[in-house]
Structure formats: C-alpha cells, structure tokens
Amino acid sequence: MTAYGHMPGEAIECLSIAVELHKQEVIDAHGQVTIRVGFKIGGGIDQDPTKAPFKYPDSGVYITNVESGSPADVAGLRKHDKILQVNGADFTMMTHDRAVKFIKQSKVLHMLVARADLPPVSLH
C-alpha cells in the first residue's frame, strides 16, 4: 500500500522515513530573532487537493518547498514528502492551519514522512 491517495482516518501501512529536524534561530534584518525550519507545507483535510498547485492525490499535508541549506534540507526532507506524523501527532487527520501551528510549537521536530519514490510494502 502507498501513503499517497490514502483516505484520512483509515489505517495505513507503508514505508516511512524518520526525520529529526532541529530548528535554527536566526536574526533577521530588523534585529529580531526568528526560528527557521526551511520548508513550506500545503494540504490538510480542510483543503481541496484538486485545486492545489501540485495536484496531490489526497488531502494529506505535504512538503511543498525545501530551502537549500536549511534545517529541513540538512535533516533530509524533500519537496513532495507527505508528512504522516510530527512529534507523535497524526498529520493525516490535520487541517492546514493546525499543522502550521503544530510545527511552530517545538524546537525539535520528530517526523515520519512518506516519499513517493520508496518501494511499496510487501505484506507477505
């Protein structure tokens, strides 16, 4: 089974990648300290995937951009990875706004992501 095209709330068995991302504190041009993760997300159970620019096959939360050299890049995240969990929270049932707020909460993100180019899981 694949994580892509998964219906929210249904059990899923797929290969996933564990990622540990340590956020980075940077000082912006105005002297303000900001916390940097280096990725953007799209999707969520409240979003219509047919209207998204990348046409993802379901309403999951996806990485839509990874900045080169950022904490996300160093941790190994890739554009189009599907976020399954962050710090134990199920992202397959999360709205977009809640996902953004959840990602902002912790300095370290322990993530499980699915990647489209991984081989399928054999149940035998």
Swiss-Prot record:
Domain PDZ: residue ranges: 18-106
Transmembrane segments: none
InterPro entries: PDZ (IPR001478), PDZ_sf (IPR036034), Synaptic_Scaffolding_LAP-MAGUK (IPR050614), Tax1-binding_p3 (IPR017268)
Top-rank lineage group of the source organism: Eukaryota
UniProt-listed SMART domains: PDZ (SM00228)
Cited Pfam families: PDZ
Described function: May regulate a number of protein-protein interactions by competing for PDZ domain binding sites.
Protein's name in the database: Tax1-binding protein 3 homolog
